[in-house]
Design a protein with these regions (language model features):
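Preference for solvent-exposed, low-hydrophobicity sequence contexts
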Residues: 1-227
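Extracellular/virion structural assembly segments
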Residues: 158, 199, 213-369
Length: 369
């Protein structure tokens, strides 16, 4: 090996949809020091095409073909398996592993769990929708609610996007749902959405089972209702380590602060025109004038009591590069303001709650257009 040329194709839809226009990068590298190999970092290139505009569209997964051509020191093609090029195909999802997990803990389809979140207890605000990410690539997944509820009370369905609005035409909660992947990249991550939760029995369970032997153990999720009569519950939405959108409710007190920035200059206050030619000035005029004023608001929120397993959920929230806050009527982008957090343990703290500060990801005065 002397040089290796990489042609990287990235696209959405079904795998067969790949076109010549989907070639996003062509890169050539030479071996160094007779190592007889070269290395390409694909993930950073692919991430450029992972795009989310909340309430509009999202690209949670992509098809990727890495086509490699090898040449020797005479610039002649080195065939591999009788072929001039070799193609490696990937389904790319914008997740991550921890250092202690080793290299790429999601290297095969069956190492990705059916439930694309770590917590198997979901605390939800009474009457608000429940949204749970499910992996649909590896096998057909069946979702079952227990105890059963009449279809006029609770509805549920699957959606390709997290923010899909509910509908009264959806399946009743007394019927099972099948999570099926048709091969489209948009359906690899699906969201199980439950509406009408005011009629859902507290601590109902949602069971995910699969027809694939690689998922021999069912996943049981407990749905715990929280009724908060005093404060307005806030939902924090974020991308978790599996590359799926997830939300966590903060039920208790929240406070909002604003930080103002501006420039100042000394104003010329002398007035000849309105004082009969005698130099004068108005006492109501600003000698020190402020301009280019704007503000950034921040919010500090409190979760209420959670079980210790939510330490991992909060960790992923704090590590997320895209976070939003939902107050029951609108969704706005936010960035983490608290850069440190002490994780709590029930053996030490008895009751576990979280207080986190975020900054709204925009200036208060619109200066875009």
């Amino acid at each position: 090996l002397h040089t290796a040329k990489l042609e990287l194709y990235i696209w959405t839809g079904v795998y067969a949809d790949r076109a010549a226009t989907d070639k996003r990068y062509t890169l050539t590298k030479e071996e160094i020091g007779g190592n007889n190999f070269v290395t390409y970092e694909l993930s950073k290139l692919i991430r450029d095409y992972m795009i989310t505009e909340y309430n509009n569209y999202s690209t949670d997964s992509l098809w990727v073909d890495a086509v490699v051509e090898i040449r020797d020191s005479n610039n002649a093609i080195v065939q591999v398996g009788g072929l001039n090029t070799t193609t490696s195909t990937y389904l790319a999802i914008d997740g991550y592993g921890y250092f202690e997990d080793g290299a790429n803990p999601r290297s095969t389809e069956y190492t990705t769990p059916m439930l694309l979140q770590n917590n198997t207890t979901v605390y939800y605000s009474d009457g608000q929708d429940i949204r749970i990410p499910v992996y649909a690539e590896a096998a057909t997944v069946t979702a079952t609610l227990s105890p059963t509820v009449t279809d006029i009370d609770v509805k549920w369905n699957l959606a390709d996007i997290f923010w899909q609005a509910g509908s009264n035409t959806w399946n009743g909660g007394n019927s099972n749902l099948s999570v099926i992947d048709s091969g489209n990249s948009d359906q690899k991550i699906q969201y199980l959405i439950i509406i009408g939760t005011q009629d859902l029995v507290d601590n109902s369970t949602l069971t995910l089972s699969s027809n694939n032997s690689s998922y021999s153990t069912n996943t049981v999720i407990t749905l715990t209702k929280v009724c908060e009569p005093k404060y307005t519950p806030l939902s924090i939405i974020f991308y978790n380590k599996y590359g799926a959108l997830q939300n966590m409710w903060f039920f208790k007190k929240s406070t909002t602060d604003i930080n103002i920035t501006s420039e100042k200059f000394k104003n010329n206050m002398i007035d000849f025109d309105n004082s009969g030619g005698t130099p004068s000035y108005a006492l109501t005029k600003h000698q020190e004038k402020k301009f280019v004023a704007n503000g950034k608001e921040s919010i500090t929120i409190n979760s209420g009591f959670y079980d210790e397993s939510f330490n991992e959920v909060v960790r992923q929230m704090l590590l997320s590069e895209q976070v939003w806050i939902y107050d029951g009527s609108s969704t706005l982008p936010i960035n983490l303001k608290s850069n440190t957090l002490q994780f709590k343990k029930s053996v030490n703290d008895k009751l576990i709650s979280y207080t986190i500060s975020f900054e709204y990801a925009f200036d208060k005065i619109n200066n875009i257009i």
